[in-house]
Amino acid sequence: MTGSPLTWLSDQLFTMGVLSDALIWVVMLLFAAAGITEWYGRRSGTDLMQQARVTATTAWVGFGLFWLNSVPFWWFEHQSFVEALLALIGAPACFYAAYELYTGRTTLFVLSRAIAVMGFIYLPFETIPAITVGGVSLPAPRQYLIEVTTVITGWIISAAGYSPALVESPEGFMATYQWTLSDGHIYNVYIVLACTGLGSIAVFSGLIAAVRAPLSRKLRALAVAVPIIFVLNVFRTAFISIAAGNQLMHWFPDAVLFLFGETNPYRVSFLVSDRILSQLGAVVALMAITYLVVRELPELLTVLEDVLYLLTGEDHDLQAALELPREPVAEQPGASQGD
């Protein structure tokens, strides 16, 4: 029936909207509640492990449902095969984490705390809209971040010798670079939240915050991860804008259009530069950043080993495999302090 709750629910399933926003906020609150319960029980000597375990298990199940629900969005709407694949892998991994945590793998509490921190960093930018309080209009938090990223991206584009027009995006932000092609066609490149690097910054911040280590080393790890991620993202965004705005990667158009279910030939350069090259490059970059961060904060190895266990069902010793120290390099006995 038109306008019925069932109709609304069917419209909200397998996309990103009000239902998915509500679900992910509930999941993050459950992760946070589990972390606080486990921490309080440990600090006070009270046996609250069962309550924390049940809460965290529920959160993991909800997290799995969120990723499962998002797969069609990433595949069909966002046209990102990498993100769709990650969501498809993430859903059963979350269900498996719920099972493992409930049956006794308590090291997963660290990853649970990390996810809570990630969510509280990322979700305000993703879900909070512009509001008016007492007659004063407050922009959506995402607007600040997107427009700052747009300005910095523009500096890089200008330094490369290009000068597209900066116009308003569909969201109402000054965050679109408008290119005029040689045949007179107008092509717009939109700067969105994903271009800011916020997602990756939230992931590393959550992981760093969740482990037990001295604050000084956590800050050093953040100082390694956050600037690198942001700088790489603005250069990536500038690269995509230049490539798409000048049709520099109009490669194998028929194959690319078929692969992404597109018909617009002007989209080929964007799809190649963003959905293929940049996303594959991002995977490599994140692996390299992870290696650098772990050298500053070896406690993260436990979390990474848990993630690998969820994906493979086997325990791994990353310290031995990657020849990484369990102590940070600068703090190892006898470490060189310079020539």
What are these regions, as identified by a protein language model?
Residues M1-D339:
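Hydrophobic N-terminal alpha-helices or hydrophobic patches in metabolic proteins across all domains
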